[in-house]
């Protein structure tokens, strides 16, 4: 659903305009929730360094992350961006291992390389011998977005756990820092959201569901698990539905190289899950 929503919404707005519109909706969503819950008052009890950390992290995610992600979706077919985006299930535990100072095993490294082989299949349209990349900028941005997303969520979770902060308050601070910057850049770049129903609906849906409710559920899941790989197992549920929506709603013809690449990526992720359960 996410890939279809992103690509459809980008028909009405530039990536910068879309993230600004969606982030405004998300900021309002989190603002209402922290006010109703009464957690906004606790900002005065937080250390200034912690508040500053939450604000600065907002420049990374949502501001920079979603601009990178939406630009990747703007440059790539939705099916390719969606498939590459699934490697967050691999990137997240790798980034987490850096913070926990544990090196991945040779098996984990091999499975990671297998997943990235799938990306190579997608990026070259299956022409691995020639290594001629189709839309290399979009592929690079899609990959970069998984690193930025994983990095921001691991750091955010550590800040929340170390300081016993309400996760939704932390997210509200993230968006509070990102929003002024996004609007300034949007205005200066002359990329204001378009005045259309599609623009409004796309911004509201992405801001409320993909960046609002989804953020709340994901943050709670991150706090309740001691192993991010367990959460990333949910990644296997979405690809068939995503491809169906992309084909029917966006009328994209699903390429054979996309299917093959996605299967290889999911094989690597499945291997990671098997290793986790075998420990």
Q: Each PLM stretch: what is its role?
A:
Residues 1-24, 59, 117, 128-158, ...:
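Glycine-/small-residue-enriched transmembrane alpha-helix faces in small-molecule transporters
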Residues 9, 18, 22, 72, ...:
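Hydrophobic/aromatic residues within transmembrane alpha-helices
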Residues 12-20, 46-51, 124-148, 187-205, ...:
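Juxtamembrane helix-entry segments on the extracytoplasmic side of multipass membrane proteins
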Residues 18-21, 80-87, 156-177, 211-248:
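Helix-helix packing/entry segments at the starts of transmembrane helices
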Residues 34, 88-113, 225, 239-260:
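C-terminal transmembrane-helix exit sites in multi-pass transporters
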